[in-house]
Amino acid sequence: MSQKLVLILNCGSSSLKFAILDPVSGAEKLSGLAEAFYLPDARIKWKLNGEKGNADLGAGAAHSEALNFIVSTILTEDLKNSIAAIGHRVVHGGEKYTKSVVITDEVIQGIKDAAEFAPLHNPAHLIGIEEAFKAFPHLKDNNVAVFDTAFHQTMPEEAFLYALPYSLYKEHGVRRYGMHGTSHYFVSREAAKRLNIAEDKINVITCHLGNGASVAAIRQGKCIDTSMGFTPLEGLVMGTRSGDLDPAIIFYMHNTLGMSVAQIEETLVKKSGLLGLTEVTSDCRYSEDNYEKESAAKRALDVFCYRLAKYIGSYMAIIGENLDAIVFTGGIGENAALVRQITLNHLKLFGYKIDDEKNSAARFGNEGVITADNTPIAIVIPTNEELVIAQDTARLSF
């Protein structure tokens, strides 16, 4: 076992996901979630060396209390002493950050500058960085920021620009940035390994499907397009987000229906997607389990898969070379066999033929090719964003 471990922090506005990984073996020593920050029932749960635990953090507790609890109560002395660096997931790096970086005062300012593009996430990441500096002062120079947007910074101008007045981009940074970059990067590299193709030669379309969902076109190992845009609202149908829609619907909701901007934002971000279409839940498992018996479940899944297939088809065109594979990952991508089946059935024109037995088997941690022999490849690969963060952090710190 490597004696140098990486603590990984993923700070949300009201939660903190954490893990400790060996960046060499990938072994997970600790994982956990602190949630309900600032509320009366703030709490934390964890798994340490296979043993589960949970505790109340106290009314109104937040990031500081959670990290202090991790350090003082959860971590053993040996584990604490083995932490050699800290990796921070940062949602938005703007145009400035195209790769992971050691956190300096300049980087902190860059994360602040990009906060206008991720107003819920980036300020929370900054709190996490500040608290990590306090909790591990001896590791201040060994904190690394890993940006969700970085992998997509290779998109060409024709992919990232909107057809808006160019001044909005030049003066205000209004362009497409994309998200889930760490996941798209990881599974594209894993696909290259499994298919025995060099990382800088792999051509894949990666589908990260979860409560948030996005697809990326990767040509010769580099991202050339992705479905999320200026914010994570653009693109695919998601758990509660609408994805693509006619912008004039917003004018209609405001001018004709009398909805405020705040109400419209809440509708598009929190009340749409699978939740809006089913009028029941944002959980894809409901739509999958009830597909044959509930019209709302069928409606939601059909729209979800149609939108996904349309993106995949368009990305086949822009990759413009032999496509090595379609990759499914994320909670839905890795487990929802019906979603994969319906989506690939839309792509029969391109030769895709699902193997029902392989597709059904590729769930709950099982992976592999799900298409028939001698047909174009679609493959399920579980994502591991934490491992990428750990490896990048180790590479820049050790």
Curated annotation (Swiss-Prot):
Family (UniProt): Belongs to the acetokinase family.
Catalytic site positions: D148 (proton donor/acceptor)
Protein's name according to its UniProt entry: Acetate kinase
Gene: ackA
Keywords: ATP-binding, Cytoplasm, Kinase, Magnesium, Metal-binding, Nucleotide-binding, Transferase
Record's subcellular location: Cytoplasm
Cofactor(s) named in the record: Mg(2+); Mn(2+)
InterPro entries according to UniProt: Ac/propionate_kinase (IPR004372), Aliphatic_acid_kin_short-chain (IPR000890), Aliphatic_acid_kinase_CS (IPR023865), ATPase_NBD (IPR043129)
Pathway: Metabolic intermediate biosynthesis; acetyl-CoA biosynthesis; acetyl-CoA from acetate: step 1/2
PROSITE patterns hit by this protein: ACETATE_KINASE_1 (PS01075), ACETATE_KINASE_2 (PS01076)
Cofactor binding comment, as recorded: Mg(2+). Can also accept Mn(2+).
Catalytic reaction list: acetate + ATP = acetyl phosphate + ADP
Record flagged with keyword Magnesium: yes
Annotated binding of Mg(2+), by residue: N10, E385
